[in-house]
Amino acid sequence: MSFIKTDDNVKLFYESTGKGEPIIFVHEFAGDYRSWEPQINYLSRYYQCISFCARGYPPSEVPENESSYSQERAWRDILSVMDNLQVEKAHIVGLSMGGFATLHLGINAQDRVLSLVIAGCGYGAIPIDKTNFNKEADFSNISLDSAKIILNKGMD
């Protein structure tokens, strides 16, 4: 198993395969590095494909402190993967939760990105309308229900 350390000293599990221009795959809430297996199986013939488990997703470290988790931490973790693997620039592919991290990386570290592929990143809710957004999305209950299912049944 291969691990890197983030700039705040959290161990992240990663896999890298193939040669060529690097593509980094960032998984969704209910996934992990394996979510990208079909894409990596094909694209690793032509590119260096890197996938990793976000913090909180074993075998990556699961910090207990809530302050260890944020949108900023998520995009900085992508940079930590790049830095540890000596990847100067990469194509970044993110889905859902990983899409948000990918979007934030593109905004905050444009010089490290060759391209962004972002899917399921949200519908662009207006921040001042948080009450209506929460009613529409019911995000906290959906997330809690998903977490309970994963905890009880696992991810396989």
Which role does the model predict for each range below?
Residues M1-I23, R45-Y47:
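Alpha/beta-hydrolase fold catalytic core
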Residues K19-G20, E28-G31, S96:
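Active-site glycine-rich loops that stabilize anionic/oxyanionic intermediates
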Residues E28-P38, C49:
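Serine-hydrolase catalytic-loop signature spanning alpha/beta hydrolases and amidase-signature enzymes
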Residues A30, A54-P58, Y123:
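Alpha/beta-hydrolase active-site loop signature
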Residues N41, I50-V93:
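Active-site loop/oxyanion-hole signature of alpha/beta-hydrolase fold enzymes
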Residues G94-G98, T102:
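Gly/Ala-rich beta-loop-alpha elbow adjacent to hydrolase catalytic centers
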Residues L103, I107-N108, L114-I149:
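Flexible "cap/lid" loop of the alpha/beta hydrolase fold
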